[in-house]
Amino acid sequence: MKKILAAMLLILIVILAAGAGYQWWSSGNGNKKQFQKSQEIFGNPLMGYAPSAWYENVSEDISLLYMDITWAELEPEEGVYAWDSIEEENQINRWKKEGKHLILRFVCDIPGDEKHMDIPRWLYEKTGEDGTWYDGEYGKGYSPDYNNKVFIEEHEKAIKALGEHFGKDGLISYIELGSLGHWGEWHVNYSEGITRIPEEAVRNQYIMPWLEAFPGVNRLMRRPFHIAEAYGMGLYNDMTG
């Protein structure tokens, strides 16, 4: 009987507290705001199309810009990171002053018009030059062997360095998980003899370093792999229309 009375008393206290809270809120002490219909066009913060961070002119309502960094740009010499040139090209100081935010994608292979690599020469040599040079439908370039254990180890170090440099001040709002495949989009044109993207166990080794390096940042994937759901990641697409 005592337990029943105690439970009833607790319920009564909760009801009275809720009623008092509602009375306080409805009396005008709460934080209320009434919006009016408008035909005005206004920006949607941190959403939608993001212009490149190197653009000189962006509209005032833009709050989000896009920055990609190739491994060749990031680490031209082993353990030496080219922060100054990266920040200058992407106008980092400007965007910080203007209160903008960035999307970051790390890329190891961007097809182009001429033969080239988007990983540094030292890494190419350290991994035994075991990737694939290609010249096909997408363009020309070099596709690393993403199963290479040395490549995976060095990738983890590079992501850690990115997190230590860019992951402390809130500038980066989104990470587009790149690293693998053409344009960092987790696919390759294997019909031209390029080694396929690795199986799940290896792919995940390219994901976990990002979770540790940028713990408070929204993360996006190009493909709906299982791990995206497990860690609450969104999806991105470079196309419109």
Task: Tell where the protein language model's regions lie, with residue ranges.
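N-terminal Sec-pathway targeting helices
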Residues: 1-13
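Hydrophobic alpha-helical membrane-insertion segments, chiefly the h-region
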Residues: 14-24
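N-terminal membrane-anchoring alpha-helices
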Residues: 23-29, 158
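N-terminal substrate-binding region of glycoside hydrolase catalytic domains
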Residues: 30-147
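Catalytic-core regions of glycoside hydrolase
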Residues: 31-54, 61-66, 96-100, 174-183, ...
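Short, flexible loop/turn elements at secondary-structure junctions
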Residues: 69-73, 78, 106-110, 170, ...
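An active-site-proximal structural segment forming one wall of the substrate-binding cleft
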Residues: 91-96, 100-102, 125-176, 200-213
